[in-house]
Curated annotation (Swiss-Prot):
The keyword Endoplasmic reticulum belongs to this UniProt entry's keyword annotation: yes
Membrane topology, record value: Multi-pass membrane protein
Ranges occupied by Solcar repeats: 8-101, 113-205, 213-299
Reaction catalysis annotation: ADP(in) + ATP(out) = ADP(out) + ATP(in)
GO cellular component: endoplasmic reticulum membrane; mitochondrial inner membrane
Location, primary (coarse class): endoplasmic reticulum
The name this protein goes by in its record: ADP,ATP carrier protein ER-ANT1
BP-aspect Gene Ontology terms: adenine nucleotide transport; mitochondrial ADP transmembrane transport; mitochondrial ATP transmembrane transport; root development; seed development; shoot system development
Length: 306
């Protein structure tokens, strides 16, 4: 067991994390597309790719259905699944790797150091994964915000994921695929640190006794953590996606501070939180990933022990 422990554990974490993510993200794809449109409508109106603003969650759902059809709720989902499988699976796997690397133990190092180790391992996992896979998130964002209601020529900007890469590389080069990457690392580090760190820290305190191994309890804990982390990190997500949408446009934000100033000046503070309600609903999918991964983890290691 000692010889195969590390390599098999890394592989199992990778596969189980990705499998849980694919199911949850595909189910939540309609909500995620609504969130992207609400969050980025200011930029879309500015560039002429949206005629009038969405007034809320219900209005956005209605207009997508009426103007684009049911299947359009899954527009960009292919890119999302391609992105999310390696992203989520790598996050779980790298989290375990960094956690073992730091080697913090609650019994040996005390609660505070153990908590800090959990937060650090979650943050490092998110940052490492993003370095390799950010361009896929860019493609997903561009497809998700590509509304049919366009005042430029009445057509969509992109035919599909390959077209996103082709047009972006042609107009902006590799840099265009990584626009907003800097602020993304800050936001992801904050979000993943809370997402993984708090879950790993609170789980052994809350999920004990009759609640140990309980899917509903694990799900509710995961939902509360993903919602809290998502709300805190949301402005960073808005900034990076707004910067993404300027690739291929004649006028771009010079940097994150410039983007923040321009958005606050023209749209106000609330613009940083547009779509946050939909994002909270997406926390249900995130909680499902955490709870599902936890259940798969228990089943797999029980099998290994036997």
């Amino acid at each position: 067991m000692a010889l195969i422990g590390k390599s098999e554990r890394f592989s199992a974490d990778f596969v189980m994390g990705g499998a849980a993510a694919i199911v949850a993200k595909s189910a939540a794809a309609p909500i995620e597309r609504v969130k992207l449109l609400l969050q980025n409508q200011g930029e879309m109106i500015k560039t002429g790719h949206l005629i009038r603003p969405y007034t809320g969650l219900g209005n956005c759902f209605t207009r997508i259905y009426r103007e684009e059809g049911v299947l359009s709720f899954w527009r960009g989902n292919q890119a999302n699944v391609i992105r999310y499988f390696p992203t989520q699976a790598s996050n779980f796997a790298f989290k375990g790797y960094f956690k073992n690397l730091l080697g913090c133990s609650k019994e040996k190092d005390g609660y505070l150091k153990w908590f800090a180790g959990n937060v650090a391992s979650g943050s490092a996992a998110g940052a490492t994964t993003s370095l390799f896979l950010y361009h896929l998130d860019y493609a997903r964002t561009r497809l998700g915000t590509d509304a049919k209601e366009c005042s430029v020529n009445g057509k969509r900007q992109f035919k599909g994921m390959i077209d996103v890469y082709r047009k972006t590389l042609s107009s902006d080069g590799i840099k265009g695929l990584y626009r907003g990457f800097g602020v993304s690392i800050v936001g992801i580090t904050l979000y993943r640190g809370m997402y993984f760190g708090m879950y790993d820290t609170i789980k052994p305190i809350v999920l004990v006794g009759s609640l140990e191994g309980n899917f509903l309890a694990s799900f509710l804990l995961g939902w509360s953590i993903t919602t809290s982390a998502g709300v805190i990190a949301y402005p960073f997500d808005t900034l990076r996606r707004r910067m993404m949408l300027t690739s291929g446009q004649p006028v771009k934000y010079r940097n994150t501070i410039h983007a923040l100033r321009e958005i606050l000046k023209s749209e106000g503070f609330y613009a940083l939180y547009r779509g946050v309600t939909a994002n909270m609903l997406l926390g249900v999918a995130g909680a499902g990933v955490l709870a599902g991964y936890d259940q798969l983890h228990q089943i797999a290691y029980k099998h290994w022990v036997q």
